[in-house]
Amino acid sequence: MTRYRRVVVKLSGRAIAGSAEFGFDSNALEHLAREIIAVRQSGVEVAIVVGGGNLFRGNQSDRWGIDRVEADNIGMLSTVINSLLLRGKLTALGEDNLRVMTAVPVPAVAEPYIRLRAVHLLEKGATVILACGNGQPFLTTDYPAVQRALELNADAVLAAKDGVDGVYDSDPKINPGARLFSHLSYDEVISRGLRVMDQSAFILARDFGMPLHIFDIEQRGAMTAICRGEHRGTVISSSPEKSEEFGNEVLASPAESTA
C-alpha cells in the first residue's frame, strides 16, 4: 500500500551532472533512472519535471552579455536535452511506456505539453517527463514543478536534491552544526527565508495545499520510501497538525549524526 497515487518528481540538472557538476555523469544518470523505475514498480504514477542547470542557467545572462529572456530560452532547451537523455536511459533499462512533453514546442523530438493528455498518459501507466518548465522566462523549474503537480492532480511534489538530505536551518556545507528540519509549514519556510527552492514555488504550494518532500536523491530507495509513507528528509505542508507523523522537530546536525 502506498501513501501517494501520483507524484511529480522535481529533478535538478545538478542531479544528472552528479560528481561532474557540469554536463552529465553516467553513474548518476543510471542511479536516477533506477530510482524512478523503483517508484513506478511500486504502483505510483510518476511525472518528472527536469531542470537544466547542469548545462545552462538563465541567470548567467550577464556573464555571457545576452538578454535574460534569451538566456532563459537556452535554459529551457537545456531541460529538453536532459529529458531526452533520461528517456534514453530509462528505455535502455527496459522501460517502454515513456513520454517527453515540452512547454515550448520541439516537435521533432517530443510532444507538446497538453494537460489532459498528460493526465491520460499517467492514468495509462506512462512515465511523463516534462521539459521547458512552463515555457516562461524569469523562472527556475521549481515553480513549474508545483504548477504541474496541481494541474495533473498529483498528491505531492518530491524535490530531489543532490547531496542535501532536507531543509536545514543554515547551510550544512558551511556550518557543520546546521540542524535538519523534519517538518516545516510553508509559512515557516517563507518567513525564515530558507532557500532550498524558490519562494514562488513555496507560495504556490501553500495557496493550494500541495505537500513538498525535500530529500537526497543519492539515498537509494528514498523516493519509494516516501511514497510508502516512510519519512525521509523534510516535509513541507500546511501545518504540523496536518502532518503529525512527522512533527516539526529539528533533527540532529550532520556532525552529531556522525559522532
From Swiss-Prot:
Class of this enzyme: transferase
The Gene Ontology terms for molecular function here are: ATP binding; UMP kinase activity
Q: Which InterPro entries match?
A: AceGlu_kinase-like_sf, Asp/Glu/Uridylate_kinase, Uridylate_kinase, Uridylate_kinase_bac
User: Does the keyword Cytoplasm belong to this entry?
Assistant: yes
Q: What Enzyme Commission number does this protein have?
A: 2.7.4.22
Question: Which protein is depicted?
Answer: Uridylate kinase
Q: Which biological process, per GO, is one annotated for this protein?
A: UDP biosynthetic process
Locate the region Disordered.
Answer: 236-259
On assembly, the entry states: Homohexamer.
Q: Where does the record say this protein resides? A: Cytoplasm
Where it mainly occurs, coarsely classed, is cytoplasm
Q: Which residues bind ATP?
A: K10, L11, S12, G13, G53, R57, Y168, D171
List UniProt keywords, sorted A-Z.
ATP-binding, Cytoplasm, Kinase, Nucleotide-binding, Pyrimidine biosynthesis, Transferase
Documented activity regulation:
Inhibited by UTP.
GO cellular component terms?
cytoplasm
Q: Quick one: which residues bind UMP?
A: G52, D72, N134, G135, Q136, P137, F138, L139, T140, T141
Q: What biological function has been recorded for the protein in this entry?
A: Catalyzes the reversible phosphorylation of UMP to UDP.
Name the Pfam families for this protein. AA_kinase
Chemical reaction(s) catalysed: UMP + ATP = UDP + ADP
Q: In which pathway does it act?
A: Pyrimidine metabolism; CTP biosynthesis via de novo pathway; UDP from UMP (UMPK route): step 1/1
Task: Report the sequence similarity comment from the record.
Answer: Belongs to the UMP kinase family.
